[in-house]
């Protein structure tokens, strides 16, 4: 469990005075619904009990000073002149959020910020969105700003679009802002409506980090998003008023798929079928049908591997090992892909045997050390420390 006292002491030592607020925003694991969010589709994530923490104290000027414990690096910028840092990507998440809040005509004053996290970076658990939402919420606390969770998520997403250069969907930021303990959230990424679904007590969610790291910015992620948008353009003459692949059904693709070139048809097929799987998965989990939920997770992985082509050998190995391990209902890659993690749904009374089988199997197959995370569905962003001093 993360020790707030360690962050408090580090802040006081570095800045010379104690923090007045500490905020946390969780990482997330997506149970199913991958690469659907930027297609106006459905996703089914849960917030984790792993989080990014921001200790903060307001200043009397317009300067923001930041120190990242994880990167052992510092940044300083002026709220009146926020520009991208071309060398260091991590600082752009923070600068972008500040810029986004100011763009909404929200008054900000300078601040000292110290950031730490126990969300593994690059593992597909959305450490970046946790950072954005935690920083945005911290600025809210320091400046007496009241944004709805959905609004905070949109500010955070905008930071990633404009300052980081990744055209991400809204899922990661939304679950970081709105997560509910003990539940996954079925989110409609078109209108941002959501429905909490309880995770049955007899099930556990286990995340396995492949150890393979991805770089999303400027990579194949943006190419796939562009491909999906092109598929919509090509299908519009036949299907009429479609705005995104969310509006296309499998039966539509069966009839009009010939309108798409060979490189785009598999992309569209994945997104369309994944939306259908995600809605079915929420119903299955709500009914406590873990077998059905697991089957849908496996079908999702096959689609991500074969049609969307975002899996890698290590992720496929983890899924194969999981499906052969004791008590596993289903397993799939989770996150953007090209590395990162898998998520498995496991019977609670088989978790220890499952974890042992995964560790041994992955070491034999790849020579890599695996540290599976048995995850609890956590709450969304919150203030975890507030002093009486302002």
UniProtKB/Swiss-Prot annotation:
EC number per UniProt: 2.7.1.6
GO biological-process terms attached to the record: galactose metabolic process
UniProt: ATP binding residues: 68, 122-128
Active-site residues annotated for this sequence: 172 (proton acceptor)
One Gene Ontology term of the molecular function aspect: magnesium ion binding
Gene3D superfamilies assigned: 3.30.230.10, GHMP kinase, C-terminal domain
Protein localization: Cytoplasm
Function statement: Catalyzes the transfer of the gamma-phosphate of ATP to D-galactose to form alpha-D-galactose-1-phosphate (Gal-1-P).
Full protein name: Galactokinase
The species this protein was found in: Chloroflexus aurantiacus (strain ATCC 29366 / DSM 635 / J-10-fl)
Lineage of origin: Bacteria, Bacillati, Chloroflexota, Chloroflexia, Chloroflexales
Underlying gene: galK
